[in-house]
UniProtKB/Swiss-Prot annotation:
Disulphide-bridged cysteine pairs: none
CDD domains tied to this protein: MLTF-like, PBP2_YfhD_N
Name listed for the protein in its UniProt record: Membrane-bound lytic murein transglycosylase F
Encoding gene per record: mltF
A molecular function (GO) term: peptidoglycan lytic transglycosylase activity
EC number: 4.2.2.n1
Entry membrane topology: Peripheral membrane protein
Transmembrane spans: none
Pfam families: SBP_bac_3, SLT
Taxon lineage: Bacteria, Pseudomonadati, Pseudomonadota, Gammaproteobacteria, Pseudomonadales
Its job: Murein-degrading enzyme that degrades murein glycan strands and insoluble, high-molecular weight murein sacculi, with the concomitant formation of a 1,6-anhydromuramoyl product. Lytic transglycosylases (LTs) play an integral role in the metabolism of the peptidoglycan (PG) sacculus. Their lytic action creates space within the PG sacculus to allow for its expansion as well as for the insertion of various structures such as secretion systems and flagella.
Taxonomic source organism: Pseudomonas putida (strain ATCC 47054 / DSM 6125 / CFBP 8728 / NCIMB 11950 / KT2440)
Alphabetical list of InterPro entries matching this protein: Lysozyme-like_dom_sf, MltF, Solute-binding_3/MltF_N, Transglyc_AS, Transglycosylase_SLT_dom_1
Family: In the N-terminal section; belongs to the bacterial solute-binding protein 3 family.
GO annotation (BP), single: cell wall organization
Amino acid sequence: MFAHTALRQRCAKWLLATGLFLLLGACVEKPSTLERVKEDGVLRVITRNSPATYFQDRNGETGFEYELVQHFADDLGVKLQIETADNLDELYDALGKPSGPVLAAAGLVSSERRKTQVRYSHPYLEVTPQVIYRNGRPRPTGAKGLVGKKIMVLKGSSHADQLAELKKQYPALQYEESDAVEVVDLLRMVDEGQIDLTLVDSNELAMNQVYFPNVRVAFDLGETRDQRWAVAAGEDNSLLNEINEYLDKAQKNGTLQRLKDRYYGHVDVLGYVGAYTFAQHLQQRLPKYEKHFKSYAKVEQVDWRLLAAIGYQESMWQPEVTSKTGVRGLMMLTQRTAQAMGVSNRLDPRQSIQGGAKYFMKIKEELDDSIKEPDRTWFALAAYNVGGGHLEDARTLAKREKLNPNKWLDVKKMLPRLAQKQWYRQTKYGYARGGEPVHFVANIRRYYDILTWVTQPQLEGQVAEGNLHVPGVNKDKPADKSSPM
């Protein structure tokens, strides 16, 4: 009897202890997603490798999505850790893994098929889905014209969803979804005639058009849509709420607009002929002078590709060019500037590049200290073209209009006014062809973007061997030189 009583007491104590342990365990709340990120000190993000999202150059990681999410990580006070997915299915699946990324920032458009997997953030970029065809082939003018065409799109994309809906209306419509390609590959396949059509978003086309000057927009397929970030559907609201607050703030404080201007504000300046010509000169002319650009860029501590872009804008990498106004050489130096920079022969490409590099950095160093990068570079380019005095006049006009005189996005709006009497009569330095520096900067930014992309470490071997696909090179020249749009 006594033994049974003792046993019951021991069991009761054990049950009580177990119950207390379970009760205490239940009282310890699981940290939220946001708390985990802050405790770890790392924001793990998955994206796509493309010019419009994320890629690496000699200076490190870059891209629209990368910069936007880097600002978010900075706001959280944590480090950013990026991984890339080979395809959209892999990207979405990674969000559901316990040790995987907590955020997808990859130019995503909300998709019905993904709603059980993820939840989407507030929008940050408006894009238009576009049907792309090759110049010289019949142009489809509407959805019915897609029937009978060889079409390929990214597997699991919103474009695949659109085609699936159209197939209900046009049962004969056929298309292929591929997880072995990226947008760049699809555009190349259209450019080379491997497929008839593809669907891409307008921002992706804008970033890649110059590499594939044969591609054209047939028509917009549907209304504009919003790009968003995504988090796993199973996560709590903490991180998504923080993301939405950040994106709303970025919209209001100008962060988003500055990034849009940096990555998309200059992408349509080349046109078809410019894209084709630049593609040729990239392989035929640049190699002759690349060592000089690199050498003097190192001396002046400037990116050699920026110097090369300036040289292309000035002379198309032709060392013996002379303008009607007397500027000469690869970097198109005036006699006065050449003398000041120690250049004795403006037609010597080595001396011209040396003088141009030195002059550009001199201008940049003389700018007001309140002008920060990347705007400082764009201001220096404008001053290189139009002169520092006229640039200051434009900054003064910007102040009067309650715009930011230290932001290129604002000052470039004022420069064209220097050609209008009602405005230039109010300035210190008077009339200037103010529209020219705006185009000058836009062109150089575009050339620089292309040079940055094609000189990625993983592509340099192909460039050196002449195997890199650059549109218009190693192919028959397209017959039509009309505008791409």
